[in-house]
Amino acid sequence: MNDFVFLVVACLLTAGTEGKKDGYPVEGDNCAFVCFGYDNAYCDKLCKDKKADSGYCYWVHILCYCYGLPDKEPTKTNGRCKPGKK
C-alpha cells in the first residue's frame, strides 16, 4: 500500500512538467545556427525565441549553444547537416 501511495504522489509531482535540455538548436535539417563574429547577443536572442533560458556563441564550433531548451525543441545530433532537407 505504501508503495502505491508513493507511486501516485510521484506521478502527480511529475505530471505536466516539461523537461529542459542544453544543446545546439537546429532546424529540421540538423543544421545548427552559425554565429559569425562570436555574436553572443544574437545567440542569446535566438535561444530565448526558442523558449530557452539563455544562450551564447560557442567559439570553438562557432555555433549557438542554448541552456534550458524545451524538450520538444530539436538539438544537434551526431548526423550530418543536410541543408534543404526539412
UniProtKB/Swiss-Prot annotation:
UniProt cross-references to InterPro entries, sorted A to Z: LCN-type_CS_alpha_beta_dom, Scorpion_toxin-like, Scorpion_toxin-like_sf, Scorpion_toxinL, Scorpion_toxinL/defensin
Signal peptide bounds: 1-19
Q: Which UniProt keywords apply?
A: Amidation, Disulfide bond, Ion channel impairing toxin, Neurotoxin, Secreted, Signal, Toxin, Voltage-gated sodium channel impairing toxin
Gene Ontology molecular-function annotations: sodium channel inhibitor activity; toxin activity
- Specify the domain of life of the species encoding this protein: Eukaryota
Note the CDD domains from the entry. Answer: neurotoxins_LC_scorpion
Q: Which residues form the LCN-type CS-alpha/beta domain?
A: 21-82
Which family, according to the similarity comment?
Belongs to the long (4 C-C) scorpion toxin superfamily. Sodium channel inhibitor family. Alpha subfamily.
**Gene Ontology biological process terms from the UniProt entry:** defense response
Could you tell me which cysteines form disulfide bridges? 31-81, 35-57, 43-64, 47-66
* Protein name, per record: Alpha-toxin TbTx5
Specify the taxonomic lineage.
Eukaryota, Metazoa, Ecdysozoa, Arthropoda, Chelicerata
List Proline amide occurrences by residue: 83
Q: What is known of its domains?
A: Has the structural arrangement of an alpha-helix connected to antiparallel beta-sheets by disulfide bonds (CS-alpha/beta).
